[in-house]
Curated annotation (Swiss-Prot):
Group of enzyme by EC: transferase
EC number: 2.7.8.7
GO biological-process terms attached to the record: fatty acid biosynthetic process
Molecular function terms, GO-annotated: holo-[acyl-carrier-protein] synthase activity; magnesium ion binding
HAMAP family: AcpS (MF_00101)
Family: Belongs to the P-Pant transferase superfamily. AcpS family.
Lineage: Bacteria, Pseudomonadati, Campylobacterota, Epsilonproteobacteria, Campylobacterales
Entry annotated with the keyword Magnesium: yes
Residue sites binding Mg(2+) per the record: 6, 51
GO CC terms: cytoplasm
Predominant subcellular localization, coarse grouping: cytoplasm
Protein name: Holo-[acyl-carrier-protein] synthase
Domain of life: Bacteria
Length: 119
């Protein structure tokens, strides 16, 4: 089991959205994530979650695992979970995973715990 965490100032994401608008969202989020995230706090939480997940895999966001390789969603109870792109699944076999996202005091934070094997 590997753990990753990330924290980001919500206003940093808000400034990027103000500056780049939909271009920013489309570069880092899936269409489903954009549709689900009505508030900037949610977008910041998704950003932090993707970073935390990549850190748990031990590679961070980059050539091996990109923002679009990780998709964040919520189950029927509102709990967050993630899926990986088909390309990323060629690299990782996930046995179990859990993520938590929270925001307060102007920050969004996420923690990911993932039991996996690398190919």
């Amino acid at each position: 089991m590997k753990v990753g965490t990330d924290i980001i100032q919500i206003d940093r994401i808000e400034k990027l959205i103000d500056r780049y608008g939909d271009t920013f969202k489309q570069r880092y989020l899936s269409k489903e994530e954009i549709a689900a995230a009505k508030k900037v706090e949610t977008l910041a939480g998704y950003w932090a979650a993707k970073e935390a997940i990549a850190k748990a895999f031990g590679c961070g966001i980059g050539a091996q695992l990109a923002f679009h390789d990780i998709m964040i969603a919520k189950d029927s109870r509102g709990a967050p979970y993630f899926t990986l792109s088909d390309e990323a699944l060629k690299t990782y076999t996930i046995h179990s995973a859990s993520i938590s996202i929270s925001h307060d005091g102007g920050f969004a934070i996420a923690v990911a715990a993932i039991d996996f094997e690398a190919a």
